[in-house]
């Protein structure tokens, strides 16, 4: 028995396949899901989702959202999702370094929140390709 994984973004179905295991980036840390997991709804943070199929592991950068686990079906609703193949590694590294610098320079509360969001997004994309 396996999990049916569906990753949805506002504009498309990003992933709709079976998997043996997933690891989700929740707001309270990483959460693993195997078959017959208890039903749960959880908020997702910006980060890397790992998916284990019968053959290998695949990673996807998620940009925040929610996940519903119920009866071996996992529905992931996210603002955006990216695969390794769609990200330019040098651009991702440059964006990560710039976001890190902006986070260090941020002064006001609003600036810090915006810089932290940009940093987390850039870090997820960079981690995916490195």
From Swiss-Prot:
Keywords: ATP synthesis, CF(1), Chloroplast, Hydrogen ion transport, Ion transport, Membrane, Plastid, Thylakoid, Transport. SUPFAM superfamilies: Epsilon subunit of F1F0-ATP synthase N-terminal domain. The keyword Transport applies. Gene3D superfamilies: 6.10.140.480, F0F1 ATP synthase delta/epsilon subunit, N-terminal. Pfam families: ATP-synt_DE, ATP-synt_DE_N. GO terms for cellular component: chloroplast thylakoid membrane; proton-transporting ATP synthase complex. Disulfide bonds: none annotated. It is a peripheral membrane protein. The keyword Transport applies. Signal peptide: none annotated. One of its GO terms (molecular function) is ATP binding. It is found in: Plastid, Chloroplast thylakoid membrane. InterPro entries: ATP_synth_F1_dsu/esu, ATP_synth_F1_dsu/esu_N, ATP_synth_F1_esu_C, ATPsynth_dsu/esu_N. F-type ATPases have 2 components, CF(1) - the catalytic core - and CF(0) - the membrane proton channel. CF(1) has five subunits: alpha(3), beta(3), gamma(1), delta(1), epsilon(1). CF(0) has three main subunits: a, b and c. Belongs to the ATPase epsilon chain family. Produces ATP from ADP in the presence of a proton gradient across the membrane. This is ATP synthase epsilon chain, chloroplastic. The gene is atpE.
């Amino acid at each position: 028995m396996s999990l049916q994984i569906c990753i949805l973004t506002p504009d498309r179905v990003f992933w709709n396949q079976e998997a043996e295991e997933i690891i989700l980036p929740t707001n309270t840390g990483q959460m693993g899901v195997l078959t017959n997991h208890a039903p749960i709804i959880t908020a997702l943070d910006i980060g890397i989702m790992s998916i284990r199929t019968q053959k290998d592991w695949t990673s996807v950068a998620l940009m925040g959202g929610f996940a519903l686990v119920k009866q071996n079906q996992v529905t992931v609703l996210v603002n955006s999702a990216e695969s390794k193949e769609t990200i330019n590694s040098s651009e991702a590294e440059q964006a990560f370094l710039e976001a890190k610098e902006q986070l260090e320079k941020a002064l006001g509360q609003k600036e810090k929140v915006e810089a932290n969001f940009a940093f987390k997004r850039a870090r997820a994309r960079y981690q995916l390709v490195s």
